[in-house]
Amino acid sequence: MNTVPIPRVVIAGTNSGVGKTTIVAGLLAAYRASGHGVQSFKVGPDYIDPGFHKIASGRESYNLDSWLVPPDTLPTFFASMAGDADLAIIEGVMGLYDGGREGVSSTAQIAKQLGAPVVLVIDCKAMGESAAAIAMGFREYDKDVDFKGVILNRLGSDNHERMVREGMEKIGVPVIGAIRRDDRMHSPERHLGLTPVTEVDPTEAIATIQHAVESMVDLEALYKVAASAAPMPAPIDITKGVTKRTKIGVAYDEAFSFYYPASLSALEAQGAELVYFSPLKDSAIPDVDGLVFGGGFPEMFLQALSENTAMKESISKANQCSMPIYAECGGLMYLCEHIHDFDGNVFDTVGVVPANCVMQQKLQKVGYVTATAKRNTLLGNTGTALHGHEFHFSTMEPTIEEFPWAFHLEGGRKPQSYDGGYATDNVLASYLHLNFAGSLEGAKHFVDMCEAFGHTK
């Protein structure tokens, strides 16, 4: 097997909220400004953090998830996505050892699968040498993790930094960065986490973070850590030589922005030409053979989505003509008859799915699931099993008695077993988030269905 050197480092945290995304954005911008081609990755299924990565690095950011993409393919997948970059920075998820059940897709698991060294971010606010005890615990917990050092965050003063550094020296943990507390260094939040970059302009904040990182992180030392990683399998271009055989419309705007770039690339690798359109701003779907509606925040744009009757009619007409339509989460909500917002207001939506979606104050589902098809769908025949992820605040309430449930689902953070999604011969809509890079057969099946429909037009 051919191998190539890919300098890479995981920026992990002790827990959520320690400043991983902020620091990674600063690192990406700083290395980019110094002339490095830097490629970013995010552990887990999160859609929002990679958007900040992209602004900072100037490149698409890719998710690394051992549930959505088979673990044995992750190294090759990673190498392919790293491409020609001379440095890869991987942002962890939650705490270093947190993930799904039995550590599935934890930062530690991904780091070991990729042979990537780890640097731990510690929020040092309101602690001194105790930070060293935390670092020692993380270092000792799993000796197979290549623990290389720490970045100290939210330090209050020179004296505060000195105390923490002295503690790290006692246990032999290198301090690669020491960042001072700065209220300007944060990202806006929403009920799913951070606010997407499609709704905010983080450029000024990233510039502030970049300057802080350049002066407070030893970028040369961090690069040496990344360069210590062993060579990896040579990358593979999955789209090379592929003949385009069908056009698929992809809904993309402020309301629908949750797409894994690798998932879209997987559709292209199967012969799809992707054509982007906006359910918010356009009056009709493009001339295509199939439609994809990703997740996002349609609940924040209900007035505009509801008032764009021309677009809704265009989608309904496509459905009546049996055009293949695939939707995830926010896309499912939009395809329903009505959406009830957080305040109880009701908005008319497309009406392809005979159900209403109701926003709830509490999170309804979160976690990794296995979805087994209860009937033939756009992604495969009855019995096809898919690995996906759910995270939503709304509930779907069918308006017909004989509702054609798409999947039987098992899993979640609180393990459950339930039916979900909607499936007909030409529509598949559910709360399930998939990465087609890990479901290539599903991607092929959908592209095949779109191509077949195109021949009937």
Predicted regions located by residue number:
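Phosphate-binding active sites in nucleotide-utilizing proteins
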Residues: 244-320
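C-terminal and late-domain segments of enzyme folds
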Residues: 111, 242-244, 256-268, 273, ...
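ATP-dependent carboxylate-amine ligase catalytic core
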Residues: 2-114, 122-149, 158-162
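A short helix->loop->beta-strand "cap" motif at the edges of active sites that frequently abuts
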Residues: 116, 173, 320-324
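Cysteine-nucleophile active-site neighborhood
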Residues: 274, 298-378
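Short, surface-exposed amphipathic charged segments that create phosphate/polyanion-binding patches used
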Residues: 78-79, 185-200, 289-293, 367-369
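Internal gly/pro-rich beta-alpha loop/helix module
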Residues: 128-240
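Residues that mark the start of a beta-strand
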Residues: 8, 36-39, 245-247, 273, ...
